[in-house]
Amino acid sequence: MKKFIYKYSFGALLLLSGLSGLSSCCANSYGSTLAKNTAEIKEESVTLREKPDAGCKKKSSCYLRKFFSRKKPKEKTEPVLPNFKSYADPMTDSERKDLSFVVSAAADKSSIALAMAQGEIKGALSRIREIHPLALLQALAEDPALIAGMKKMQGRDWVWNIFITELSKVFSQAASLGAFSVADVAAFASTLGLDSGTVTSIVDGERWAELIDVVIQNPAI
């Protein structure tokens, strides 16, 4: 019986001591101990976050590890401008074949066929990218099949818009490099039987869609 009383008394004592400890931790403004305010909690959390890595024995090694572990931002690469040929440089047979392939593909192939031939088209475009813009337009104007293909492309709005947009970018790059000399523009207009002043105005204004339309409507054939 005594053993039971001692055991019960000891358990009650532990329970009371636990409750008193809990009440002291959570006491309000009327208690003897105040709860931690928000600022103190924030300070402790900041302190905990600022502790060095457990694996770092020296501060210098920790800083170096953090420095080299940071991801470096990717450097922006500037687009490489084409090294345009001279207007007087004649187009090669392979360049003419590539030009013909691009025009015929854009004019005749279905959307699915164009997607499947995307790699071939890009390859052909890259090979004719450095042809002088006026020499390229002259080659178009002098080939009836290419003129017919260009007119078909005009009837396919989405194809034509992409073609004009990409071609205009290249022509503007050429203009920024000073590829359109007064003599070249005059020679181009004379060869195609166009008004030199009109062509000069179009080139100076970089109205490339208009220039292409003039060539299509006035072929040298």
UniProtKB/Swiss-Prot annotation:
Where is this chain's protein located in or outside the cell? Cell membrane
Residues making up the signal peptide according to the UniProt record: 1-24
Question: Lipidated positions for S-diacylglycerol cysteine?
Answer: C25
Keyword match Cell membrane: yes
* Gene Ontology annotations for the cellular component aspect, listed alphabetically: plasma membrane
This protein's UniProt keywords: Cell membrane, Lipoprotein, Membrane, Palmitate, Signal
Question: This protein's superkingdom?
Answer: Bacteria
What membrane topology term does the record carry?
Lipid-anchor
Q: Can you locate the N-palmitoyl cysteine lipid attachment residues?
A: C25
Entry's PROSITE patterns?
Answer: PROKAR_LIPOPROTEIN
Instruction: Give the protein family.
Output: Belongs to the chlamydial CPn_0875/CT_734/TC_0107 family.
Know the name of this protein? Probable lipoprotein CT_734
Q: What is the native source organism of this protein? A: Chlamydia trachomatis serovar D (strain ATCC VR-885 / DSM 19411 / UW-3/Cx)
